[in-house]
A protein has these predicted regions:
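As written
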Residues: 102-108
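C-terminal output helix
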Residues: 115-126
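Receiver (REC) domain active-site loop signature in two-component systems and cognate sites
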Residues: 62
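Conserved acidic segment of CheY-like receiver
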Residues: 4-16, 20-24
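Acidic, metal-coordinating helix/loop segments flanking the phosphotransfer/catalytic sites
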Residues: 21, 35-55
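His-Asp phosphorelay/catalytic-motif detector in bacterial-type signaling
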Residues: 4, 29-30, 51-55, 80-86
Length: 141
C-alpha cells in the first residue's frame, strides 16, 4: 500500500463514476483518481504498472470480469498480493452470498453504496482516513 499512490475505482455505471469523481474532488485528496469501467482493464493496469496504488474501490456486478472474479485474480497473483493494496467492495447490494464470498477472498471491506451524495462523501472520507492511518508491511522503516 502506497499512501501517495493512485486511488483505483472500478465502476461500470457512468453516473456512479461521475458522483464518485465529484466526491473525491470535493474531499481534495492529493492522490490521482483512476477509473476503470471493466475489471479486465483494471487487472491489465495493475499487472503492467510499476505504480503501487493506495486503495482499490470495486463494484461487484460488472460485465465480463466481475469484481469478485477480479479480486480472486489479484489475490492469486503473488506480485499484486505482495503490494498489499487494500481492496474494498463499494456496491449497491449486500447479498449474504456476496458478502461471504468477498471475505473468503480476503477483501478489506464491503460497503453498500449510499444513494445520498453526503452519505457517500462521509463513507469515502472515513474509509480513506482509516487507510491513511494504517501501516502496511511494504512501508515499515
Amino acid at each position: 500500500m502506497n499512501k501517495g499512490g493512485p486511488i483505483i475505482i472500478i465502476e461500470d455505471d457512468l453516473d456512479d463514476q461521475e458522483t464518485l469523481s465529484d466526491v473525491f474532488k470535493s474531499l481534495d485528496y492529493k492522490n490521482e483518481i483512476i477509473f476503470f469501467s471493466e475489471g479486465e482493464k483494471a487487472l491489465e493496469y495493475l499487472i503492467s504498472t510499476n505504480v503501487e496504488p493506495f486503495i482499490i474501490f470495486s463494484d461487484i456486478n460488472m460485465p465480463r470480469l466481475s469484481g469478485m472474479e477480479l479480486r480472486g485474480k489479484i489475490h492469486e497473483n503473488e506480485d499484486l498480493r505482495l503490494k498489499s493494496i487494500p481492496y474494498l467492495f463499494f456496491t449497491t447490494s449486500a447479498e449474504q452470498k456476496h458478502v461471504v464470498d468477498a471475505y473468503s477472498k480476503s477483501i478489506q471491506g464491503f460497503f453498500v453504496k449510499p444513494t445520498d451524495y453526503t452519505a457517500i462523501k462521509e463513507i469515502i472520507k472515513t474509509i480513506v482516513g482509516y487507510w491513511q492511518s494504517c501501516v502496511s508491511p511494504n512501508y515499515i522503516k
